């Protein structure tokens, strides 16, 4: 009897332990897991707030069509750019709708740091030489530093070497200079759309008459719309607040195609010139009258100096 009693007591305890393991322990473990998940989620949110994520690829290259974008060439990277503009399509079949004529520019852009870019170039239009620097002042970011916009400053100097002044006038070398200063304000709204505004001032060292101002103000607007991983639609428009006589606002629409280290840009524009002084203040054709140029830009990057990970820009 005593043995039977002991077995019954042990059996009841064993049954209680089984029930505890089956019903109570999983519940407690689940509750602990939920608490752990909550703690991990809170930790992730805390780390995200303490970390700053810089927004990248607002635009796919440093030139939208004619104008600069917010993007910089990376540190130690050389960007070779070839820009080509054919004649206007309204010249007809005799000039093969503009393909018999061409204006081009070749440029070299180099990233000194991830914030500072410098560049030089030569254009056939007015035989212009140009140089510029671009500095990224603010970078769009989220997290610890929440910055809704990216902001850059661009200063460009252009020297016109074309000898076309009428006799008996003689211009000094400094009279052939133009300067452009720009502030670029850009935002990447999502992976499919980016927008930028570009307030601009172009200065002429000399103008034909005293009735024409030396300084010209304009505002540019540009966008990028993503179609696929490697294809984007682009557009830019520069509105002149005070126009050079006989000129119109520059409008360009295009498509960008990425292929490895190359970016191909194909577009239509009413601007013949490629530098800021040329396409902003010297566009003399209108879209509605067929003064449209087909053009393309080719960009190829080369890593000249591999930056050290310890370098802060």
Predicted regions and their residues:
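N-terminal secretory signal peptides that target proteins for export/translocation
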Residues: 1-11
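Hydrophobic core
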Residues: 19-25
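Sec/Tat signal peptide C-region and signal peptidase I cleavage site
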Residues: 26-31
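Transmembrane beta-barrel domains of Gram-negative outer membranes and organellar outer membranes
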Residues: 32-169, 177-181, 186-197, 201-205, ...
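Flexible, glycine/proline-enriched loop segments at strand-loop-helix junctions
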Residues: 168-173, 210
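A mid-sequence, solvent-exposed acidic-amphipathic segment
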Residues: 192-239
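Membrane-helix boundary/juxtamembrane motif in polytopic membrane proteins
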Residues: 214, 246-248
